[in-house]
């Protein structure tokens, strides 16, 4: 599914926990729909049976490699079930995390960056990937009183390693970095500007 034809736009927001991804993703979808576009919010990892089984029945076997392959399969099904049909129907799909989350988190857990990238080599490439950069202390402070699906990833030293991998991916030109330590409205304006610029280049 690495190269398909579609008339929509695939937008991904990445960042450590507490960077504001979910809030800004939903703000963006609401705004785009208000402007007359067709926009849809989605997220990864999904709530598929695959992820839940590995986190449950097979949790004792989890490591960076098992997680990377689990999330890659979850991603493929997510693409086939939801993302690609929406893109072909002309939607702007805004995904709260995608394959670069797997690269960052599984590399921070011990898998080589390039191996995780290779595992995801044939995943559909986003049209726009925005990394919301915030220091781990700020991110985890924001998440302090919020429920989380993956508490094992919310440890300060681990969050620092995750951020280092994200910054390496930015350096490789795979993502656009936006300072997310500012008020949410300021961060959102910058994100919206990037997406509207990308939309202006989509053939009509």
List each language-model region with its residue ranges:
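Hydrophobic anchor at the beta1->P-loop junction of P-loop NTPases
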Residues: 13
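ATP-binding Walker
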Residues: 18-19
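ATP-dependent small-molecule kinase phosphotransfer cores
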Residues: 35-121
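Pre-Walker A (Motif I) flank of P-loop NTPase domains
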Residues: 6-10
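NTP-dependent small-molecule kinase module
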Residues: 2-4, 29, 137-204
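A glycine- and Lys/Arg-enriched "phosphate-lid" helix/loop adjacent to the NTP-binding pocket
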Residues: 102-164
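Walker A/P-loop
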Residues: 22
């Amino acid at each position: 599914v690495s190269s398909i034809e579609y008339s929509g736009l695939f937008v991904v927001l990445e960042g450590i926990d507490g960077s504001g991804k979910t809030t800004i993703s939903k703000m963006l979808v609401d705004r785009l729909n208000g402007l007359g576009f067709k926009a849809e919010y989605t997220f990864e990892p999904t709530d598929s049976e695959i992820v839940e089984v590995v986190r449950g029945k097979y949790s004792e076997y989890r490591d960076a490699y098992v997680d990377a392959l689990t999330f890659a399969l979850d991603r493929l099904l997510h693409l086939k079930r939801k993302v690609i049909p929406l893109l072909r129907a002309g939607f702007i799909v805004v995904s709260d995390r995608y394959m670069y989350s797997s690269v960052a988190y599984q590399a921070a857990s011990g898998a080589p960056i390039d191996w995780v990238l290779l595992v995801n080599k044939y995943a559909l490439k986003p049209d726009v990937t925005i990394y919301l950069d915030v220091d781990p202390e700020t991110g985890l402070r924001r998440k302090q009183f919020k429920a989380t699906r993956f508490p094992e990833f919310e440890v300060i030293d681990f969050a620092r390693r995750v951020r280092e991998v994200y910054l390496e991916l930015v350096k490789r030109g795979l993502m656009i970095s936006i300072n997310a330590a500012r008020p949410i409205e300021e961060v959102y304006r910058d994100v919206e500007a990037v997406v509207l610029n990308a939309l202006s280049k989509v053939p009509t």
